Each structure stands twice: as structure tokens, then as C-alpha cells.
Swiss-Prot record:
This is Phosphate acyltransferase. Belongs to the PlsX family. One of its GO terms (molecular function) is phosphate:acyl-[acyl carrier protein] acyltransferase activity. Pfam families: FA_synthesis. The gene is plsX. GO terms for biological process: fatty acid biosynthetic process; phospholipid biosynthetic process. It catalyses: a fatty acyl-[ACP] + phosphate = an acyl phosphate + holo-[ACP]. Catalyzes the reversible formation of acyl-phosphate (acyl-PO(4)) from acyl-[acyl-carrier-protein] (acyl-ACP). This enzyme utilizes acyl-ACP as fatty acyl donor, but not acyl-CoA. It comes from Actinobacillus pleuropneumoniae serotype 5b (strain L20). Pathway: Lipid metabolism; phospholipid metabolism. It is an enzyme of class 2 (transferase).
Length: 344
């Protein structure tokens, strides 16, 4: 296995280095050929880095910057203030070839904008799309894109998302002819706005893609499709609704309620039985395990973590980035698009 270097925006996210540094420690422990280039404030990071094992510290290069991009500022303001920030420096390291990929939990709009500005897009890609794997109740996963990089998308752009999602599913899920579906408010031919209906007609004509039609949001976790295509506005809402529902289910089972002693005892035994029997299934829908959306369509791997991610969730975002780099996702997307367009 070859050595791999990731650039990490240590300051990105709601909790900064208190989360990112313990998470990268887990990644270093799991991957002996992994190293990091970190970008962040030395005064905040040094105590946490010094607590890591010496063998891990030897695989970390630290670059100090006190500048960060705030999570709540508009996109244009974020770009103007980005020079010298931890996010921009991490992306510039990837652009220079000093790292094979970047992970950040910072401002989504700024990350998407800077990544498109600094990292070369793949040929024939109009716009990259935020892409992730969502869990299904049968233990398998589905690819979903776009999740917020493009709030608006016309039919041509949605078809391009379908092409990229198709290749991503082939590589990451080891599928042949993945089933593609278009997110809509119904499955009937006349449902949806004009863009959705036009996209539906275009995809029906693509015999190189296994397009199966519309899918509704209540079926997203039923594995009716391997790839779910949507604009960034709809995708972001749908994904957060899924994650919120999953978190509420998990917390509901753990949360104590003011019942009588007898009810509490009965409930405790019941919940214990449920957890023993369904623990693995519950973990399959744990949003932490699926944290990290890839900005698909760039020549390097860029992964966006949830800003509010905890240590385990951030570790999974790093782990997903590593897996995509090892799988050569950017090259596979480029080769796959060339193959698809040659067959048109």
C-alpha cells in the first residue's frame, strides 16, 4: 500500500481542533501509511498534538495560520476573506500536489467555491456535486448527489450528475449497471417541475445508463435505487431529514422517561433486548458512519464533513477520503465519462 498524505483544515467545524485532532489520531492509528499536513492555529492545536503518541506526531506536518473562514458569513464575503485561511491553505496544498486530498468541516459555500477555484476540474465537468453514500435498511448503501453544491440545476446538469453518480457507484459499491433514480414528489410521469420532467425524458433515452425512473423521499433508505439524483436544494433537505430522523430514533431508545419504577424496569429490559437484537441494524443508519460528502467532479478528492460532527463522525469523513483516494475516484470518474461520451 502506497503512502498517502491528506491536507486537513483543523479549524473547520463547530469545535475545531478539539474534534479534528482526536479524529486524525484515530485515522493514523488505523492507517500506518497515512500522514497529514495540518493547517490551523498553533496555540490551540499544540497542546492536543503534543498529547498524541510520538509515532503519530512524526507523521504530521503543521502549518500555522490564525485565519479562519467563519461558518455563518455569505459565500462572496468568505472568498474575499479566504487568503491565508486554514481552509484555503489546505486546498492550495492539494493543488500544489503536496497532498492527495483535503478534508474540512468549514463553511460549505466557501469550500465548494474555493475548491472549484483552486483545484482543476475534470474535463467536460460543468459543475462538481456534493456526493455521499446513504444507508439502506438492508445493510447496503446508495449514492446520492447533489447535496448542496448547486442549489439550482438544469436538466443537462442533472444528467451529468447521473453520469458521475453512476461511475461512483460502480467503483465504490462494486456494482455493474447501477440503478439510477431521479428524486421527485411522485412517481407518475406528470409529477414534478419542468426541469425534473425534462431530465426524466433525457435519462430515459440514455441506454448506457440503467435509469429506472422517479423515486420519492420516503423510499430513499429502502434501496430501490443505487444512485439518487437531485439538485442541491432538494438533496440537502432530504439528507438532513434522514439524518435527523435517524438521530432521533437512536436518542429515543436511549433517553430515560419519568415512568414508575416497574415501567422503568420493564422498559430497561425491553430496550436491552432491542439493542442486543438490532444493534447492528441501528448502527447501519447511524449518521456518524456516513459523515463526509465528496465534491465529485474535481481532479482531487475534497471531502466536506458536517460542521457539528463529533470525533467518530469526523474520523469517518477522513476514512471516506482515504478510501476514495486509494480507489482513484477522480481518474475513474474521468475515464468513465470519456467512455460514456464515446458511446453516445
Amino acid at each position: 500500500m502506497n503512502r498517502l498524505t491528506l491536507a486537513l483544515d483543523v479549524m473547520g467545524g463547530d469545535f475545531g481542533p478539539r474534534i479534528t485532532i482526536p479524529a486524525l489520531s484515530l485515522a493514523l492509528e488505523k492507517n500506518p501509511m497515512l500522514s497529514f499536513v495540518l493547517f490551523g492555529d498553533q496555540s490551540q492545536c499544540s497542546p492536543l498534538l503534543n498529547s498524541l503518541p510520538v509515532t503519530q506526531q512524526q507523521r504530521i506536518t503543521f502549518v500555522h495560520t490564525s485565519r479562519i473562514i467563519e461558518a455563518d458569513i455569505p459565500f462572496t464575503q468568505a472568498l474575499r476573506q479566504s487568503k491565508g485561511s486554514s481552509m484555503r491553505l489546505a486546498l492550495e496544498a492539494v493543488a500544489r500536489g503536496e497532498a492527495q486530498g483535503c478534508v474540512s468541516g468549514g463553511n460549505t459555500g466557501a469550500l465548494v467555491g474555493l475548491a472549484k477555484l483552486l483545484i482543476k476540474p475534470l474535463p467536460n465537468i460543468e459543475r462538481p456535486a456534493l456526493t455521499t453514500l446513504i444507508p439502506s435498511m438492508n445493510g447496503k448503501s446508495s449514492v446520492m448527489l447533489d447535496l448542496g453544491a448547486n442549489v439550482e440545476a438544469d436538466s443537462q446538469l442533472l444528467c451529468q450528475f447521473a453520469e458521475m453518480g453512476n461511475i461512483f457507484a460502480e467503483v465504490m459499491l462494486d456494482l455493474v449497471h447501477p440503478r439510477l433514480a431521479l428524486l421527485n414528489i411522485g412517481t407518475e410521469e406528470n409529477k414534478g417541475n419542468q426541469i425534473i420532467r425534462d431530465t426524466h425524458q433525457l435519462l430515459k433515452q440514455r441506454y448506457d445508463l440503467n435509469y429506472i425512473g422517479f423515486i420519492e423521499s420516503d423510499k430513499l433508505m429502502n434501496h430501490f435505487a443505487d444512485v439518487i439524483i437531485c439538485d442541491g436544494f432538494s438533496g440537502n433537505i432530504a439528507l438532513k431529514a434522514l439524518e435527523g430522523a435517524a438521530k432521533n430514533i437512536l436518542s429515543l431508545l436511549k433517553k430515560p422517561t419519568p415512568d414508575s419504577h416497574l415501567c422503568q424496569t420493564a422498559k430497561r429490559y425491553l430496550l436491552r433486548a432491542i439493542f442486543y437484537r438490532y444493534y447492528r441494524k441501528l448502527q447501519q443508519i447511524n449518521p456518524d458512519r456516513h459523515n463526509g460528502a465528496t465534491l465529485l467532479g474535481l481532479s482531487s478528492v475534497v471531502v466536506k464533513s458536517h460542521g457539528g460532527a463529533g470525533v467518530n463522525a469526523y474520523f469517518y469523513a477522513i476514512d471516506h477520503a482515504i478510501g476514495q483516494i486509494r480507489s482513484g475516484i477522480p481518474d475513474k470518474i474521468s475515464q468513465g465519462l470519456n467512455r460514456l461520451h464515446q458511446n453516445l
